[in-house]
A protein has these predicted regions:
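Conserved flavin/dinucleotide-binding core of flavoenzymes
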Residues: 14, 20-24, 28-57, 166, ...
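Glycine-rich FAD pyrophosphate-binding loop
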Residues: 83-106
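Dinucleotide-binding Rossmann-like beta1-alpha1 core, especially the glycine-rich loop
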Residues: 109-194
Length: 544
């Protein structure tokens, strides 16, 4: 057993013991709250892995124009661009989860993120995304400036963040300002303005616009932790903070991600603003705005017609289980997510807006497109929503923030959804959303644990930051808990990701089957997904 796995199992056991004690005390005083554990994408994901649908009898085919597979950021961005250009005869198959990693959690009148919870203010290079936000009324003016004007109600409200450090809460997530931290952030200010010998920004979002200068791209040959050590950074608090940022954005720590990715996180957006765009339900709010803007209409079932035509784009609750391209169309076998009924569509063009690891399992002759099964590491996450019938008691002088982080924790902290509500009085009930990136062992080993772990162990991981902040008394406020397991939540930008041959091949492919996903950038943020969605839509329109 390797050291990483021993460390992971030891930490699991320690947290489980602490959680068991916390639960025992809670059970003695209260009835345990309902707990739902959702393994998102199962069992369909394993059926696709095992090629369960390749020999399925085919139903009668129906013809359609443009078909989008998926409903995450790339899919809805592609649909936004198509409808903006007048292409409205579009079918969107939602995929296994509505809105993908931007899903919402809903409990009665309460809303919270079920996945991604914020959008950083987009860089000047994110032209299409800025246009999209302007279309939605979120970006009010200055779309071409360094920092445009955004609608105040869409920006994170104060207090934005706090860190529990040495037994006390403080405002900033960086624990201390010391010589190392000042040196590091002075470097970041220079890197924000740095250009390679080809004249392009060294660090840009979208990442494909970054410089290809070999001297800078050499950073992609070592890990961020190795680079930090080489450059003489020793401050424990700075190193913890940088590792936390990597886990928060990439699902893996500084010892696992590329040095280029580690610096890109801080330098790519160019502007100095730390504000973000967010809503109570996270990026599900943005997804819903895009659905409404695009006029996307849900259909319980497709009409029984040989040729399908729609005046407005329609959405069906189905997932692609097989894709085959021919000379004059793309044949897609869809499975209804509820009934399991199979539908066969022959589309003139298809935008495949799903993770590349999934596309490699469902596309016939996947290697033709550069898709290779088993390539790329994906980080497993827990996104856990704690429904509270009252707010936990804060210490004297302490104020709950939107983002609440515990120094030294294996978790990523918790989000208070109610922070974004516009109201005079604090609501009686609320939701705290806890995030955990499980990077303590090899992702495959973690996924095996996630499949078999008892609910109490999962809850222990989910609740570790909340019990660290409030102690056992936290459970007295808990009404219910929902744990979403995202076993392949995001692609990890490990050393070598900039020159990944698979990604280069898929990006270069041109045919009736277009790929659009943040995976094409080697890491997962909304800006990258939106970029690839718009790129795919432009190729659809160019082919007529």
């Amino acid at each position: 057993m390797n050291h990483k796995r021993r460390q992971f199992l030891a930490q699991s056991a320690a947290i489980s013991v602490a959680a068991a004690a916390s639960w025992l005390t809670h059970h003695q005083l209260n009835r345990p709250p309902p707990l739902a554990v959702r393994r998102i994408g199962l069992p369909l994901g394993h059926q696709l892995r095992d090629a369960a649908f390749w020999d399925a009898p085919l139903p009668r085919a129906q013809d359609c124009d443009v078909l989008i597979l998926g409903s995450g950021a790339a899919a809805l961005s592609a649909l936004w661009f198509l409808t903006r250009q007048g292409q409205r005869n579009v079918i969107l198959a939602e995929g296994p989860e509505r809105n993908g990693n931007n899903a919402a959690f809903v409990s009665g009148e309460l809303r919270a993120p079920g996945g991604a919870h914020y959008l950083a203010l987009p860089s000047r290079e994110s032209v299409a995304l800025r246009e999209m936000l302007a279309d939605l009324g979120i970006l009010e003016s200055g779309a071409e400036s360094e920092v445009p004007r955004f609608r105040e109600t869409d920006l994170v409200f104060a207090p934005m963040e706090r860190l529990r450090y040495q037994g006390r809460w403080q405002e900033a997530l960086l624990p201390l300002q010391d010589d190392d931290s000042r040196r590091f952030f002075a470097l970041i200010q220079r890197l924000k303005r740095a250009h390679g010998r080809d004249g392009r920004k060294v660090f840009a979002i979208p990442i494909v616009l970054s410089s290809e200068d070999s001297e800078w791209r050499a950073l992609d040959r070592l890990t961020f932790a190795d680079w930090l050590a080489r450059e003489g950074y020793r401050s424990p608090t700075l190193l913890w903070y940088l590792d936390y940022c990597c886990r928060d954005d990439y699902g893996a720590g500084a010892a696992q991600v590329s040095a280029f990715a580690g610096l890109h996180y801080f330098a790519a957006r160019g502007h100095g603003s730390e504000a973000v765009l967010t809503w109570p339900e996270g990026l599900a709010h943005l997804s819903q705005l895009l659905r409404e803007r695009n006029g996307l209409q849900p259909l319980a079932a497709l009409p029984d017609e040989t040729t399908l035509h729609f005046a407005q784009p329609v959405a069906i609750n189905a997932s692609a289980v097989r894709i085959r391209e021919t000379d004059d169309h793309v044949e897609v076998l869809l499975r209804d997510n509820d009934s399991g009924t199979l539908t066969l569509l022959r589309a003139r063009q298809v935008i495949c807006a799903m993770p590349l690891m999934v596309a490699a399992r469902v596309v016939e002759d996947a290697a033709r497109y550069g898709l290779l099964a088993g390539r790329g590491d994906y980080a497993p996450w827990l996104v856990s929503n704690f429904v509270l019938h009252r707010f936990p008691t804060e210490g004297a002088g302490d104020a709950l923030a939107w983002d609440n982080v515990i120094y030294g924790s294996g978790g990523l902290g918790y989000i208070a959804a109610s922070n974004q509500l516009i109201r005079v009085a604090k609501p009686a009930r609320t939701v705290f959303t806890a995030y955990s990136a499980l990077n303590h062992a090899d992702p495959a080993a973690v996924r095996q644990w996630l499949l078999a772990a008892p609910d109490a162990e999962l809850l222990a991981f989910a609740a570790q930051d909340l019990t660290a902040a409030y102690g056992r008394r936290f459970w007295r406020a808990v009404e219910a808990v929902d744990i979403g397991i995202r076993a392949h939540a995001m692609r990890i930008p490990r050393p070598g990701y900039l020159d990944d041959a698979q990604l280069a091949a898929v990006r270069a492919h041109r045919s009736r089957l277009h790929f659009a996903h943040s995976d094409l950038s080697g890491y997962s943020v909304f800006e990258e997904a939106a970029f690839w969605g718009v790129e795919a839509a432009q190729r659809v329109l160019a082919q007529g």
